[in-house]
Amino acid sequence: MINNKPSLDWLENPEIFRVNRIDAHSDTWFYEKFEDVKLEDTMPLKQNLNGKWRFSYSENSSLRIKEFYKDEFDVSWIDYIEVPGHIQLQGYDKCQYINTMYPWEGHDELRPPHISKTYNPVGSYVTFFEVKDELKNKQTFISFQGVETAFYVWVNGEFVGYSEDTFTPSEFDITDYLREGENKLAVEVYKRSSASWIEDQDFWRFSGIFRDVYLYAVPETHVNDIFIKTDLYDDFKNAKLNAELKMIGNSETTVETYLEDKEGNKIAISEKIPFSDELTLYLDAQNINLWSAEEPNLYTLYILVNKKDGNLIEVVTQKIGFRHFEMKDKIMCLKWKRIIFKGVNRHEFSARRGRSITKEDMLWDIKFLKQHNINAVRTSHYPNQSLWYRLCDEYGIYLIDETNLESHGSWQKMGQIEPSWNVPGSLPQWQAAVLDRASSMVERDKNHPSVLIWSCGNESYAGEDIYQMSKYFRKKDPSRLVHYEGVTRCREFMTRRHESRMYAKAAEIEEYLNDNPKKPYISCEYMHSMGNSTGGMMKYTELEDKYLMYQGGFIWDYGDQALYRKLPDGKEVLAYGGDFTDRPTDYNFSGNGLIYADRTISPKAQEVKYLYQNVKLEPDEKGVTIKNQNLFVNTDKYDLYYIVERDGKLIKDGYLNVSVAPDEEKYIELPIGNYNFPEEIVLTTSLRLAQATLWAEKGYEIAFGQKVIKEKSDMNNHNSESKMKIIHGDVNIGVHGKDFKAIFSKQEGGIVSLRYNNKEFITRTPKTFYWRATTDNDRGNRHEFRCSQWLAATMGQKYVDFSVEEFDEKITLYYTYQLPTVPSTNVKITYEVSGEGIIKVNVKYKGVSGLPELPVLGMDFKLLAEFNSFSWYGMGPEENYIDRCEGAKLGIYESTQ
């Protein structure tokens, strides 16, 4: 569509989403000189326009500077803003977080495709540039890698084009608009358009130019697009590679290609063929190493465009990963091996920069994923920056690449399904926009081996438009599967070959798997990790070994979405929805991550790392069983360490290198010896990297297994050298032993004094408690209402009975408490004291039918205020709980207040 007259009407017309924008293409690097290949994305034919731009903010279009784009308009008086970046994080507009409902709820009464006339923030951007020498006299384009939500572009006062779709590149041919010397680029960005109705993701509602902006020029003959297709044969040892090219430029040229391995050896060379607008180059590669998340083997494809005399016009490079992903016998397979997605959903997010994240952020993220045994990411819920896909190719991460599509608020209101005005649904006026978003993602990302599955988007219900998108994916790229969870609610428009659900209970998944399923199952979202959470995850990972058709899931989600905010006293804090007086909002529902927004690792990650281990270690009294559940990697990449501890103190350790083939198991005897100590003996086995990798240093632990191989001897079974003195009073019973004294009260219902080395430790009698601070997920399921009588039980429990038993080497005291629950119940507390001052405490609650679930069962010990640190022998090092302790290790740990 060639149009030179912009119109604000486009903002409310879903059928106009691109004006003068060029077609999407592969994210390929290209150069005029072979020696420039090493520059990678800093290629000389590219000119970065990031930096400080002139900027003017308006709350709506009627207040904007209407003629700011004109060549003669003086912008020297307006403010500056940093590009890339969100305007809301640079002093303009307001930060707003919201989940499903649309952000204008309660402010404007709207229905698709309309937007507010009074509040639709406008950012008017201007920058000046001179075209660098390498780009002069060439066809030149401008690329906007990400602009939210809709924008108009002018160069030197001339209208260039218009585009929507926040998360894929928008590019325009500006060759005819450029001039010698200084050029003026003007961009007018609108926070809302008709596209806002289908960009209702669970995130902060930002706007502005938040990804890179750059110019690029192409040689006289240029490889405009590449689509790599591979066909593996001879038991996956060899491959035929077809490079389908779209060319622009001079027909008096030839094109050829060759493939290099990581050592720089040419392993396949094509014939030279003459120029054509569309052509295919053929290679046959022998003895290849396949790509997987475990072994991300990459090759480099070089495409050479030469003049007839042999002089180079252009060299194009493309990283290649050979892999074979398919549905085989109702199982998703990589190289015919069942794949399990140990995944997370990941928003692009930074506490300082929002979704305008940096390369450093991405490197931190991908190293964290690899270090925590996470092998897959769903790009929730939009295509990520192109660099992320290159990193996933290089480091080894499987991707579900998700289209920028979510219309949650149009069909689900207050948790109820009500799709009467759902978009895009089956509305023909939205279909082209939906398909354009799919095409923009596929065309850019189609050559990345990390992408295994195309996703039609998220939580947009169902209909003909999304169904047509799924048909497009399958026709365009049969080598990948198609995902869309939303059809679970409307199976008439089934789009996928696997079952995908959100937040199903493990028992519900098991019911599906036991009912002769026709499709394999994945959880595209599970383990809602909001706040203190991620308990019970083992109930899901246990299904991996039990059912072949259970193929894993994607935790919701990777990182908290919180923003730094400065308080009146100057202190910075991480702020959530509502903290910016944003209304409507969903408050702290943006905090669902395994990491905090500042990239501090949360205790939840400890559990995930363990349950996502690809190698299981099961130690016993003599050695360890190693179950290698990798698909392709032998355990000889790791060293096996063993550590024997006596009540947490090291008595023996060592290591060896062992070889266990993929998908096999082996028992390894360890030289750990026999130990006749009264203390508890624990064997910990650990697999650690034998060599450094891109993502961790040598010696980094990737898996562990632990077992108590000898229980602590009971105090009844060995003689105590310390004799106790029992003092019976009318109210108290005193127990005196070696360097300790304890007083148990018949009146108070427990210990009233506990002294070691004549030092008092406690302030009040310890009491049982049955209530804890509610977590975010508790509040989400109304736990505080359902279980509130346990709070009353904690506060109102009544001491009702006491008894005591004396033995030669110990004394046992029994206290019974009655709880004010309905029905009523009793709890018995037992103290067993030895002469050494060891006190074993047992709390016994048998359970009563008719009561709600017990939030917690514990004892509250109030210590003197002077104590500010403690050590313990128990599970650690991170916080753990009865349903989140698989990844914790038994040992001695220290902490402070």
From Swiss-Prot:
The keyword Hydrolase applies. The active site is at E459 (proton donor), E525 (nucleophile). Induction: Late in the ABE (acetone, butanol, and ethanol) fermentation and subject to glucose repression. It catalyses: Hydrolysis of terminal non-reducing beta-D-galactose residues in beta-D-galactosides. Transmembrane segments: none annotated. Disulfide bonds: none annotated. One of its GO terms (cellular component) is beta-galactosidase complex. Its EC number is 3.2.1.23. The keyword Hydrolase applies. GO terms for molecular function: beta-galactosidase activity; carbohydrate binding. Gene3D superfamilies: 2.70.98.10, Galactose-binding domain-like (2.60.120.260), Glycosidases (3.20.20.80), Immunoglobulins (2.60.40.10). One of its GO terms (biological process) is lactose catabolic process. Signal peptide: none annotated. Keywords: Glycosidase, Hydrolase. Belongs to the glycosyl hydrolase 2 family. PANTHER family: BETA-GALACTOSIDASE. This is Beta-galactosidase. It comes from Clostridium acetobutylicum. The lineage of its organism: Bacteria, Bacillati, Bacillota, Clostridia, Eubacteriales.
